[in-house]
Regions:
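Phosphate-coordination/substrate-recognition cap region in phosphate-metabolizing enzymes
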Residues: 51-121
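Short, hydrophobic/glycine-enriched beta-strand segments
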Residues: 16-22, 164-165
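Active-site metal-binding loops of divalent metal-dependent hydrolases
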Residues: 23, 168, 215
């Protein structure tokens, strides 16, 4: 008796997820906590998004689904990325991809938090994943929110590739979850604005990292800045 190997082959259900941090913002430059507050993209941030969109166009890269945080800095980035390929009308806005809510810390620099909210400063900088600023979220709550959202999005796009435009904290949490890096461990990796991060979501096996921090659409001086 011969066995047809094609019948025994397991069909892998996988979603390819491109996850992009928004372009540089005015508050990024000033070191101000953004959270659910918003800040305009700088000229550099706009150019970063425009060049990424042009890169996708030149490589003929299109997506079966496009999702963006509904915060302005992410949505503006998503539109600029998708306009060159004519896919900007496909963008779905969702609050589930927002940055961690920082409550009373939003709009403040680290120094301002240290001066006016010393107890919060101590907890905020300790890395405690359970610390929850007044009016905000803990890291654990944020990770649970984002994992649920990304799992649901991925499950709606079996064997397709999708784009998610979001925030640095959200990109960081997915990497930590994927590589089993504890939330309270000090970050030892960069999250460049508009860097390309690609994850695989497998229906049974979960998340796996494929590409991290690809900034080859940056010019030479910007790449050098990211390395400093």
């Amino acid at each position: 008796m011969t066995i047809d190997k094609s019948e025994t082959r397991v069909r892998i259900i996988m979603t390819l997820v491109y996850i992009i941090r928004h372009g540089e913002t005015e508050w990024n430059l000033k070191g101000i906590h953004q959270g659910h507050n918003d800040s305009e993209l700088t000229q550099k941030g706009k150019e970063q998004a425009d060049r990424l969109g042009q890169r996708f166009k030149e490589s003929n890269l299109k997506f079966n689904g496009i999702y963006s945080s509904d915060l302005g800095r992410a949505l503006d980035t998503a539109k600029r990325i998708c306009q060159p390929t004519g896919q900007d009308e496909l963008i779905i806005k969702t609050p589930s991809l927002r940055e961690r809510a920082l409550g009373v810390l939003e709009g403040l620099t680290y120094q301002e938090i240290k001066d006016t909210l010393p107890r919060d400063y101590e907890q905020h900088t300790s890395g405690d994943p359970n610390y929850k600023p007044v009016g905000g979220e803990s890291w654990i709550e944020t990770q649970d929110r984002v994992k649920e959202a990304l799992n649901e999005i991925a499950e709606n796009h079996h064997n397709e590739q999708i784009l998610c435009v979001t925030h640095g904290g959200i990109v960081s949490m997915l990497l930590r979850f994927c590589l089993n890096i504890p939330l309270n461990e000090k970050r030892k990796f960069a999250i460049p604005n508009t860097g390309i991060n690609i994850f695989e979501h497998r229906h049974e096996a979960g998340w796996r990292l494929r590409t991290w921090g690809d900034i080859s659409h940056f010019n030479e001086s910007e790449i050098l800045d990211e390395m400093l």
